[in-house]
């Protein structure tokens, strides 16, 4: 598929729809009438919260509550709190936190896209939690717009899109795997499937496999250890970070999050290819254009701050 600006523009528009709080400006806009903004010389303002990765989840009971769309950390802030320090201490492995305090204008197209995909994954996970709760409770809460029929349809669709979550489904993709006929080899179909891989073999690349959680593809040799190779080439993969090869040891929430990750990665797989093409060709002008679709400039924050 040849690269065009329209391709990437459509990709990022879809990502932005799936990740509504990707930019500081959009997070800032969620803090309407924030309780501490009318006070002088305080550490915790709506602007600082937004720049630290939080959007408002305020309620009458918790008027200073905010949440990170990338790691789900939710805090009811005090006016003396430093939002960035609270985020770092409360969720040090959050992808947003690990980037550091960098201006959005300095973030690469790849980083912005990865954050959007993480945000979309978390958002789907939270939606799925609501669906599961709806079906388990047997009734619909007044504030929940999901009907049982809607919940059932969405869960069936999710199961279909996340089949490669399980070892058995990944193993089933390795039909007549070439190394299985040999003795004393490290790289077997069972070891590949257990390490998170599914087969994408063809006549040319008979030992190719891919991870549905991170989309890394490798051509394996019979002496390769599938788990070690996965760690080596994709240390940030969600499956690798969980570190539980035995899926029987997964908690329900861990399985649901991994399933959400697969679904989102499938949805934006072609988009990942577009990003690769942009970076290979070093098309700076196009990258700047499409990055603006995702991230609003900082003066949006400053303009609203001056108008309060």
Curated annotation (Swiss-Prot):
GO terms for molecular function: metal ion binding. Keywords: Metal-binding, Repeat, Zinc. SUPFAM superfamilies: Inhibitor of apoptosis (IAP) repeat (SSF57924). GO terms for biological process: chromosome segregation; germ cell proliferation; mitotic cytokinesis; mitotic spindle organization; negative regulation of apoptotic process. Pfam families: BIR (PF00653). CDD domains: BIR. BIR repeats lie at residues 27-98, 170-241. This is Baculoviral IAP repeat-containing protein bir-2. The lineage of its organism: Eukaryota, Metazoa, Ecdysozoa, Nematoda, Chromadorea. The gene is bir-2.
């Amino acid at each position: 598929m040849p690269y065009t600006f329209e391709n990437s523009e459509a990709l990022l528009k879809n990502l932005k729809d799936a990740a509504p709080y990707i930019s500081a400006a959009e997070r800032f806009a969620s803090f309407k009438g924030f309780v501490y903004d009318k006070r002088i010389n305080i550490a915790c303002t709506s602007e600082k919260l937004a720049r630290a990765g939080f959007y408002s989840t305020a309620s009458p009971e918790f008027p200073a509550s905010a949440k990170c769309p990338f790691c789900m950390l939710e805090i009811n802030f005090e006016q003396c709190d430093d939002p960035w320090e609270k985020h770092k201490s409360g969720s040090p492995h959050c992808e947003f936190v690990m980037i550091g305090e960098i201006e959005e204008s300095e973030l690469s197209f790849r980083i912005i896209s990865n954050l959007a995909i993480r945000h979309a994954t978390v958002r789907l996970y939270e939606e799925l939690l609501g669906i599961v709760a709806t079906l388990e409770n047997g009734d619909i809460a007044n504030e929940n717009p999901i009907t049982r029929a809607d919940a059932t349809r969405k869960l069936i669709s999710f199961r279909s899109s996340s089949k490669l979550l399980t070892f058995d489904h990944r193993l089933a993709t390795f039909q007549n795997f070439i190394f299985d006929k040999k003795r004393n080899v490290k790289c077997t179909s069972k070891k590949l499937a257990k390490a998170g891989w599914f087969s994408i073999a063809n006549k040319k690349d008979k030992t190719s496999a891919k991870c549905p959680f991170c989309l890394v593809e490798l051509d394996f040799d019979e002496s390769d250890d599938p788990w070690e190779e996965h760690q080596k080439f994709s240390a940030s993969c969600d499956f690798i970070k969980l570190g539980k090869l035995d899926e029987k040891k997964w908690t329900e929430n861990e399985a649901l999050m991994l399933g959400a990750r697969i679904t989102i990665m499938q949805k934006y797989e072609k988009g990942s290819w577009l990003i690769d093409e942009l970076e290979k060709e070093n098309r700076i002008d196009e990258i700047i254009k499409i990055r603006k679709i995702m991230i609003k400039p900082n003066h949006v924050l400053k303009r609203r701050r001056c108008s309060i």
